[in-house]
Amino acid sequence: MIHKHKTGINGFDIWVGEEMPSGNYLILGPPKVGKSIFVNQIAYLSALAKRPVVYVTLDGSPENIKWRMKEFNWDVEPFEKGNLFQFVDGFTFWYAYPQKRSSEFSVESLTNISKLLSVIVEAHNKTGSNGIIILNSLSTLLEHAEFQKSYSFMTGLKALTEERNCLGFAVLTSGMHPEMQINAFKHIVDGIIEMQFQTEKEKITRKIRFIGLGTRLNLLNWREFTITPDGIKLAPQMNEPQQRKNIQNSNPTPKKPNSTLHS
């Protein structure tokens, strides 16, 4: 039976029909459009709702990711202590001193795809069943491992999310990789959450769309979103049923941070 998940993001769950089915999803967009904020927000809100989270961090150390999340008042350290939130550190060995690794789960090489997958499985075993698995980012994996290895990894990650009824997200930066490679990843995932910048009447806005969610063809249309001190919020749609607009969102209202990082 396919498990269904809420992201907790303001406006997003209503847009996709309240819940997303288990599967592997690609988060695709240009630099600084909000991809990392999107997955960080999902990670925090999932743990807050007592859904297990495994966060594979290749673009920064776990400490750096936690610092960025705290900019939005998303503190995951209490969930780490309760084994509800596990980082898999694929960054520190490559870019910092190995002795500084603080995560229980880590990998020493991004070219050993089998090892990376096995460590993710170990981390997920500790958090429990279902839940969320985040890879941030697939672009960094491609920089270290050849395309075929990265594709094999995504095949393995897809199998893992299906076997364990997880919701998987892999972040990929557009403009960094050949179109053939991007299309190959689009082919293997269950859906694509695409983000972009758009210029309308000299005003730059952020837009999002969802490709590959069954018959919800209206999700192919671009929808505006903003990055606020509370995280990502989707702009209201005129055609949304009124009763859906009245559903109370589970996103808490954190204190306004001193600064935000739009990555």
Predicted regions and their residues:
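Flexible glycine-/small-residue-rich
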Residues: 89-91, 137, 212-214, 236
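Loop/turn-to-beta-strand initiation segments
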Residues: 52, 83-84, 129-132, 163-171
